[in-house]
Amino acid sequence: MQRSPLEKASVVSKLFFSWTRPILKKGYRQRLELSDIYQIPSANSADNLSEKLEREWDRELASKKNPKLINALRRCFFWRFMFYGILLYLGEVTKAVQPLLLGRIIASYDPDNKTERSIAIYLGIGLCLLFIVRTLLLHPAIFGLHHIGMQMRIAMFSLIYKKTLKLSSRVLDKISIGQLVSLLSNNLNKFDEGLALAHFVWIAPLQVALLMGLIWELLQASAFCGLGFLIVLALFQAGLGRMMMKYRDQRAGKINERLVITSEMIENIQSVKAYCWEEAMEKMIENLRQTELKLTRKAAYVRYFNSSAFFFSGFFVVFLSVLPYALIKGIVLRKIFTTISFCIVLRMAVTRQFPWAVQTWYDSLGAINKIQDFLQKQEYKTLEYNLTTTEVVMENVTAFWEEGFGELFEKAKQNSNNRKTSNGDDNLFFSNFSLLGTPVLKDINFKIERGQLLAVAGSTGAGKTSLLMMIMGELEPSEGKIKHSGRISFCSQFSWIMPGTIKENIIFGVSYDEYRYRSVIKACQLEEDISKFAAKDNIVLGEGGITLSGGQRARISLARAVYKDADLYLLDSPFGYLDVLTEKEIFESCVCKLMANKTRILVTSKMEHLKKADKILILHEGSSYFYGTFSELQNLRPDFSSKLMGYDSFDQFSSERRNSILTETLRRFSLEGDAPVSWTETKKQSFKQTGELGDKRKNSILNSINSIRKFSIVQKTPLQMNGIEENSDEPLERRLSLVPDSEQGEAILPRISVINTGPALQLRRRQSVLNMMTHSVNQGQSVHRKTTASTRKVSLAPQANLTELDIYSRRLSQETGLEISEEINEEDLKECFFDNMESIPAVTTWNTYLRYITLHKSLIFVLIWCLVIFLAEVAASLVVLWFLGNTPFQDKGNSTYSRNNSYAVIITNTSSYYVFYIYVGVADTLLALGFFRGLPLVHTLITVSKILHHKMLHSVLQAPMSTLNTLKAGGILNRFSKDIAILDDLLPLTIFDFIQLLLIVIGAIAVVSVLQPYILLATVPVIAAFILLRAYFLQTSQQLKQLESAGRSPIFTHLVTSLKGLWTIRAFGRQPYFETLFHKALNLHTANWFLYLATLRWFQMRIEIIFVIFFIAVTFISILTTGEGEGTVGIILTLAMNIMSTLQWAVNSSIDVDSLMRSVSRVFKFIDMPTEGKPTKSTKAYKNGQLSKVMIIENSHVKKNDIWPSGGQMTIKDLTAKYIEGGNAILENISFSISPGQRVGLLGRTGSGKSTLLSAFLRLLNTEGEIQIDGVSWDSITLQQWRKAFGVIPQKVFIFTGTFRKNLDPYEQWSDQEIWKVADEVGLRSVIEQFPGKLDFVLVDGGCVLSHGHKQLMCLARSVLSKAKILLLDEPSAHLDPVTYQIIRRALKQAFADCTVILCEHRIEAMLECQQFLVIEENKVRQYDSIQKLLNEKSLFQQAISHSDRVKLFPHRNSSKYKSPPQIASLKEETEEEVQETRL
């Protein structure tokens, strides 16, 4: 980054913001890059601001029993805040003084006061000086207040992040990722957007008092009539605001439902395409959209009338103020025009500034209180360690994940009695609520010496991970003692990859040791994988390492744990995603050799690992089932296999530990922090028996967005959720918002705070941060470039010259240094965080406007209608102005008039009434015309938004995966959330406001020019200067906003990344390291945001200067031109002042319209995505008069009306697959054939392309070559017809928000009897019957109440219902408990006995059921043969299969020399199969 010119700028340059000129010039001439942005001043550094606020907050905590965050903020920022408030007040005072000078100028034209004509020019100079002074005071004050708001936000951002790293796991279990992102985005945005308005809470009352005093001097008691009307108007607007918020609360639930379904669709778009559910998902979302739009229109109409009431209230304010006075004392033009000017200022203070200020304080104080509560939550407590200790000891340890759960679960069980079924059976759903009321670990004892290996085993839910968490201090023991040195390293069960290079992920901020690093890489079998990357270990990994396979991610996580020099290594099932050969090699070379002198605790279920362990601890239902050596285990616990592998009969499981639908998910439910409802009520709300979604998912919009576990901000989770990446082009007051909330757009009073506890926000079901940390993370999709880098160290001291890539490319070393990737440039940051679809022009093109306008044929006619009404309004206004300008009004009782005045007429009571009747009639006409002018416009624009959403949804569903793979899920979701919200809420009313303000300014200029033609000499240059200056500014400002939005992405991405890996971060003690990274992300965003604020103020100040010059010209032309009467001069100067008061609003609206139209540009980008083929509906076959619901195609290779496929024969010829067009081939020249009904197993290392081959079969990739099914080539039929030939069980199971019935049959083709029949076949019936409502029970959060195995059964049922003849299975047994796995095995044998099955699996017993095996190595087919031939040849399969498996396969080949190992008498045959399990 460049050094900021602000550091050397003079006072004048700072006052006029001239120091921003270089960046404006560069942005106008060329495209701005991150390197062009100026460095932030040290006063804006996140390090300095956070340290300052943290010091005051600690002081507050130490000195008071009831600490207040606002006190800490006051000590940090109060005096600067008040200084700028005084400047703002002085600027506002000039607005009250201006009408006084206007009245004196008009009075100087009174025929009876010719002596005062000579002072008019001096009064004009004074009036112009007031405008100049106001300009010089107002803009520095507003900029200073925005600056303070920004600093407050940065300081609290940092404070919240630091607190997040300290929170206890119990607190994290009650906080969702959406809450944290909301805390950082929606709540803290109030300081950026509202601090400039906060001072009006005291400025507005003073302004009103001053104005009322001045109006009293003119009109006496009549002044309060106008004030009363304004107060009534404000109350009316408040009522409209409450009505609008009622509609928005109702709509929030509907928006949330749509976004939940949309986010699930985006996250699982590959599954949607594989199942051919595009039409079903589109119909489902469009139905929700229709309901949402009904409420959107109602809210928009209310907002429209609210805004219109303000615009057209001016007539009545003046009328009600002047009428009583005129009826009593007659009319004086000076008083009319002065009153009009006063009323303009008074109206703004009463109906806008003061209510906005009150709402700002209400929202800000609410946000501060919410942040304050968060900062006082329980922190993570480190255990007391003894660094000299060499052993690990646990004595009589008992622990709960949550204390005090017993009473809650008892209440839940009592309430469940009301949910018993009609036959009297207990509702099994509530039978397991007591689980968390029991200890997760109970009376655990063990001791291991230095250098020993402890293997921890047990069935699912036995407490293995909880044991590791307790050793790390994440889970506090309620009883007992834990003893170890405290120097811990940890490898999580689910791989956690942070954005950065492979090298940075392994080193993880620790000082670099070349020898140790290379040894770890070799031991973890990463050498071959790294060698395939052009940048080697310096390749930049994005969201969760999406470019890597699951096995590669697992090995990187293990390497990170091993690289750290620790006394105790905790390894939580690190081999889950590895093939058998890689697993064996890593276990031997890494765990047994490289770490031989280290103390290790390994969670495993492998018999080979238990045999080599020094000690074994088997957990069962949280208790220690066995502790000792392997030989002792065989002698003392011959039934250990059932406890180890979980082969107890399902019916024999205890009620607390039964493998039901809740056992592994209970901790996912928790209360919203401030929601005043009970846990039980929350559960009841979540599981109502109704088909409607609205009562199931009343989450906030933010939580729905962040229900995606991919964050491209982040997310961008991202809630921001993405969590979180966007080029936000909203108006200033919403620019930092991650996602649209129920309050986006212009404030309607009284606005309800984001932190409200209304019904739409009170009851929530969400996944806590703890659950996110303990479950596999769904990865985003992005493309990352490969880069090279050399490294050097720099000190940790704050540096102003850190580049934007420092966010993730520079890493702290153990000696408080940073690892810097020097050769990584800005492009790498874009690849980690930016979407490829974001390359839109800096300024909205005219083509976008034209395309938007012509999208709906009625919109053009509506715009013409608005223009006609405007011309009518101008004509009506001229009628009033003619009466005011050509009729001399005088006080009643004063009948003196000049005979020389050609217009001299004494106004009697009768004629006064006559004039005011005309005025009232014209005012009523204008009000009616104004209301009817904008209403069709708002209605039509919402219809256009509906069309855009439909087109974009259809385009995304029909887009090829090669295009979608280049986008981030958060980026796609933000199109449907943020951009659609802008199109629904902000854009229609902003366009209306802009048109209204533009017409006011144009109309005023036109009238002034008509009354005094010489003013045209000043009008033309001013208009030209405005247009040129606006174009010059927008070219740079929009680029700065893009960069600011891009800079916001790493902030939320880093937050979400930190939360996902919090246990790892704390185990490694890298909290300071991640705090520094977070501060760098904040500094990057601050640099862009601060520069945007400065350039925006530069533009607005110069626009105001231009119009001040225009006002000066108008003033002196009207004063110096002879022959003008007081009416004409009053009209000209009053309208000129009205232009000045409306100008800034109009300018801001013009900028906002251009910014919001960028959302339209982004939507058009998605609409214009290519399609992957024409979607066609399958032909329905009828047999015996009944709909068979089986696909029939018309093809030259198939006889007419033959059902296809009939056998499932596949022929693959020269198949080549690529993820993106023009990319490297993932599979090359694959050729083989599969006979009908045959089972084929896919073999290969992790990352060899097995899953890619299955995707290629479904044509989800860019493919070349040919595949035929039963003689039909994939080129001869449509894409949907081809995919319907397959049944799919993917690795990542897709369960969308909806009923069981909808999830199994989204097209509603099958009857309940048929669905229940299939549920029986696959073993799903008992699961569904546990829920209230059965098939009508609504699943939410990706089916979080279902275990992974139950979700696999859902996929199996879908495939059975689809009547598919070819079944593709991609590691269906991953993370399954043995009971569910056996159910799936049996279901596969029964339901797909005559189908072709292609299986990618790691369990040997499943693969042994295949007749043919396809071995893939180096992107090609190495072997394809039967199991007999593969066993006789040297192959991957021969190395993987054990001797015992060969004996079971070919018992007649058993050699007499071979002696089987001693058998444990009580082991069941099925259990022995599992004991000998290995992975491929």
From Swiss-Prot:
Q: Where is this cross-link: Glycyl lysine isopeptide (Lys-Gly) (interchain with G-Cter in ubiquitin)?
A: 688
Topological region Cytoplasmic? 1-77, 147-195, 244-298, 359-858, 940-990, 1035-1095, 1152-1480
Q: Where is this region: Interaction with GORASP2?
A: 1386-1480
The residues listed in the UniProt record as binding ATP 1, with positions renumbered to this chain, are: 401, 434, 458-465, 493
Q: Which GO terms describe its cellular component?
A: apical plasma membrane; chloride channel complex; cytosol; early endosome; early endosome membrane; endoplasmic reticulum membrane; membrane; nucleus
Renumbered ranges of motif PDZ-binding: 1478-1480
Q: Which GO terms describe its molecular function?
A: ABC-type transporter activity; ATP binding; ATP hydrolysis activity; bicarbonate transmembrane transporter activity; chloride channel activity; chloride channel inhibitor activity; chloride transmembrane transporter activity; intracellularly ATP-gated chloride channel activity
Query: Where is region (Disordered) located?
Result: 1452-1480
Question: What membrane topology term does the record carry?
Answer: Multi-pass membrane protein
Question: Which stretches does UniProt call biased (Acidic residues)?
Answer: 1470-1480
User: Can you cite a GO biological process for this protein?
Assistant: bicarbonate transport
Provide the E.C. number(s) assigned to this enzyme. Answer: 5.6.1.6
Q: Which residues lie on this side of the membrane: Extracellular?
A: 99-122, 217-222, 320-339, 880-918, 1012-1013, 1117-1130
Q: Which UniProt keywords apply?
A: ATP-binding, Cell membrane, Chloride, Chloride channel, Endoplasmic reticulum, Endosome, Glycoprotein, Ion channel, Ion transport, Isomerase, Isopeptide bond, Lipoprotein, Membrane, Nucleotide-binding, Nucleus, Palmitate, Phosphoprotein, Repeat, Transmembrane, Transmembrane helix, Transport, Ubl conjugation
Which reaction(s) does the protein catalyse, per the Swiss-Prot or TrEMBL entry? Answer: ATP + H2O + closed Cl(-) channel = ADP + phosphate + open Cl(-) channel; chloride(in) = chloride(out); hydrogencarbonate(in) = hydrogencarbonate(out); ATP + H2O = ADP + phosphate + H(+)
Positions of transmembrane segments = 78-98, 123-146, 196-216, 223-243, 299-319, 340-358, 859-879, 919-939, 991-1011, 1014-1034, 1096-1116, 1131-1151
Lipid conjugation (S-palmitoyl cysteine) is at: 524, 1395
> Where does the UniProt entry place glycosylation sites?
894, 900, 909
The yes or no answer to whether the keyword Aminoacyl-tRNA synthetase is present is: no
Purpose of the protein: Epithelial ion channel that plays an important role in the regulation of epithelial ion and water transport and fluid homeostasis. Mediates the transport of chloride ions across the cell membrane. Possesses an intrinsic ATPase activity and utilizes ATP to gate its channel; the passive flow of anions through the channel is gated by cycles of ATP binding and hydrolysis by the ATP-binding domains. The ion channel is also permeable to HCO(3)(-); selectivity depends on the extracellular chloride concentration.
Annotated domain remarks: Binds and hydrolyzes ATP via the two cytoplasmic ABC transporter nucleotide-binding domains. The two ATP-binding domains interact with each other, forming a head-to-tail dimer. Normal ATPase activity requires interaction between the two domains. The first ABC transporter nucleotide-binding domain has no ATPase activity by itself.
Q: Which NCBIfam families match?
A: CFTR_protein (TIGR01271)
Which family is it part of?
A: Belongs to the ABC transporter superfamily. ABCC family. CFTR transporter (TC 3.A.1.202) subfamily.
Query: What is the designated name of this protein?
Result: Cystic fibrosis transmembrane conductance regulator
What is the organism lineage in this UniProt record?
Eukaryota, Metazoa, Chordata, Craniata, Vertebrata
Q: Which gene encodes it?
A: CFTR
